[in-house]
Amino acid sequence: MSIQIQGVSKQYGTFQALTDIHLDIPKGELVALLGPSGSGKTTLLRIIAGLEEADEGSISFEGEDLTDIHVKNRQVGFVFQHYALFKHMNVFENVAFGLKVRKKSLRPSAEAIEEKVTELLKLVKMDGFAKRYPAQLSGGQRQRIALARALAVEPKILLLDEPFGALDAKVRKELRRWLRKLHDEFQITSVFVTHDQEEALDVADRIVVMNEGRIEQMGTPEEVYENPASPFVYDFLGNVNLFHGRVHKGKLNVGSVELEAPEHKHISNVDGVAYVRPHHLSISRTKQSVDAIPAKVSYSHAVGPVVYVELKRDGTDEYLEAEISKEQFRQLSIQAGDVVYVQPKEVKVFIPEDFVI
């Protein structure tokens, strides 16, 4: 079932939580609402679910306006960060709950409920746990049960609010891959809220980056990571190095170095900032080109197969971070105090007007 969000705004007192949100989600798509705390992502999710009312705008499922339809009639499955399992019910009873409380005319038989719950527990790899209680389960297991319970009522749309936020890193990584596989099998339209960039990039078909109640950018994980539409998106989706200078006719002048800025070839003499990812900075012992920038190594540390090198730009108080392989690090044979040259391999230059939403 597709979702259409048209001109949705929401205000709490003087706080503007959402401003004129427009978003179309095709049937079967897995969309991540990504942003920092206070960006409006959870408010938008709750409005889609019917748990909150928009001040302006409309919510439609498959073209049908559901703005004034109660949450219980929207056929939505909801999974929260903290599981929200009933402590006094065992796993089977938790998963079966949504089916058992249906009005009599719509309630499946006891046999059908048992068959459905058994099938779902197998699906979420929790068969054999039917008689256990939430307190006897790990965080990852509880979240699987919460998802099974949401799927039991056969929702048309699945909404997940920071579903893995309370779990440790390893379990979180396992569960998000499992969720992706589960989604591909069910093909149910799904929207999940997260502030974890890696999670969104790893799981979603499309990412909606939100900031201060507005949508900054929408696109595939590759699009938003490789082609950020604004400084905020660039900065939010991973570490970045900044080079401040002046933009003039397609060049950013950073001290005595010129960096290419072809997208600004018609701009004359304005402030600009070049954004460069750590893995797009190369390091050499000697100056290899005119756009190489002298810097002093201040610190380095290895994380798995990658070495992070912190450097201080020559003649400034600005620090840079480069990300290189262990093999490159061995070949360079650098240590703290060494003067080297860094060269940006991929650069995105923003001017003041780009910093306005």
Swiss-Prot record:
Q: Which reaction does it catalyse?
A: sulfate(out) + ATP + H2O = sulfate(in) + ADP + phosphate + H(+); thiosulfate(out) + ATP + H2O = thiosulfate(in) + ADP + phosphate + H(+)
E.C. numbers: 7.3.2.3
Where is each ABC transporter domain found?
3-237
What UniProt keywords apply to this chain's record, in alphabetical order? ATP-binding, Cell membrane, Membrane, Nucleotide-binding, Sulfate transport, Translocase, Transport
Q: Which GO terms describe its cellular component?
A: ATP-binding cassette (ABC) transporter complex
GO function term, MF aspect, one:
ATP binding
* Record localization: Cell membrane
Topology relative to the membrane: Peripheral membrane protein
Q: Which SUPFAM superfamilies does the record cross-reference, listed alphabetically?
A: MOP-like, P-loop containing nucleoside triphosphate hydrolases
* Ligand binding (ATP): 35-42
Q: Which PANTHER family match?
A: SPERMIDINE/PUTRESCINE IMPORT ATP-BINDING PROTEIN POTA, SPERMIDINE_PUTRESCINE IMPORT ATP-BINDING PROTEIN POTA
* Record family assignment: Belongs to the ABC transporter superfamily. Sulfate/tungstate importer (TC 3.A.1.6) family.
How does the annotation summarize its subunit structure? The complex is composed of two ATP-binding proteins (CysA), two transmembrane proteins (CysT and CysW) and a solute-binding protein (CysP).
Outline what the protein does: Part of the ABC transporter complex CysAWTP involved in sulfate/thiosulfate import. Responsible for energy coupling to the transport system.
- Its name, as the record gives it, is Sulfate/thiosulfate import ATP-binding protein CysA
Provide the gene name from the record. Answer: cysA
